[in-house]
């Protein structure tokens, strides 16, 4: 525990708070995701850690280790200095087609590897794609909190993910192929990069989940006239946004699509990527902990803290440096969870109404 020092808070997600830390010995920067000890340490957390640990690919954030503090379980990961792809889009408004393709190519290569490892992400979105700090940024997929492994878990049927990115079959409440749903989310990501808006949200009423769901189910989207997008790209999007998952384009087909192959960096070609698909994957794992050690730590973290009194620095020695008038990450997280509850409520209402049916 004493090996790391706190530098700053870097955000809050579905399950915890993230902080930038520095290894005192090596000076390496790492990101730590903190999850409160006790009830929040459930099978989803264990699944996230075990799934993430098994992945070794340059387009996926590296898992390093898990540690337990008096108050939290901390997942230690590679730090991506370039921040979220979402922020880059917000600053740019939208990307050129070439820039969007550059990031989409990397996203697809990372997702392709996850699927090869029998892991579907189930929450792919701009906020879960990070960038390293290099001039030509390398994209890195993160946050495997909703992920499922077909080797370890049943087929998914729960409605998880982020409303704007969710595939029609995920709304069906029946079993679905998580890999095919991931393809849909990749398509939404591509659209947002090109247009600077979500494909199925009503721009005049973006919080109307019922309307968004209706547009998703009826594949109601269009590319604005003021955005120049090539025919090859439009054709690819039309093959991704298909309601019937059996007829949707696959990751393999995307990787062979003419639009995807244009200006494909050498490191993303199938020949260069082949090394990551070998049983003796030589990419560094960075995790010195065995699955057994990890599960033992996770089990320990299921025990709630001895005292309900908050410990400064999430159980580390450093003090929290929160300004009095600023929102704490925990409060931001509660707001996010409230929004998710509202979304789940809306989905249930739509199902109860029988208004939208999947064929």
From Swiss-Prot:
The reaction(s) this protein catalyses: L-seryl-[protein] + ATP = O-phospho-L-seryl-[protein] + ADP + H(+); L-threonyl-[protein] + ATP = O-phospho-L-threonyl-[protein] + ADP + H(+)
Post-translational modification note: May be phosphorylated.
Reported function: May play a role in signal transduction of hyperosmotic response.
Biased composition (Acidic residues): 331-343
Highest taxon listed in the record's lineage: Eukaryota
Subcellular location: Cytoplasm; Nucleus
Stored InterPro entries: Kinase-like_dom_sf, Prot_kinase_dom, Protein_kinase_ATP_BS, Ser/Thr_kinase_AS
Gene Ontology MF: a single term: ATP binding
GO cellular component annotations of the record: cytoplasm; nucleus
Coiled-coil stretches: none
Gene: SAPK7
GO terms for biological process, alphabetical: abscisic acid-activated signaling pathway; defense response to bacterium
Designated name of the protein: Serine/threonine-protein kinase SAPK7
Enzyme Commission (EC) number: 2.7.11.1
Activity regulation (UniProt): Activated by hyperosmotic stress.
Disordered as annotated region, ranges: 299-359
Signal sequence region: none
Induction of its expression: By hyperosmotic stress in roots. Weakly induced by hyperosmotic stress and abscisic acid (ABA) in leaf blades. Accumulates upon incompatible interaction with Xanthomonas oryzae pv. oryzicola.
Keyword Ribosomal protein among UniProt keywords: no
Tissue specificity comment: Weakly expressed in roots. Expressed in roots of young seedlings.
Family: Belongs to the protein kinase superfamily. Ser/Thr protein kinase family.
Positions with a binding annotation for ATP: 10-18, 33
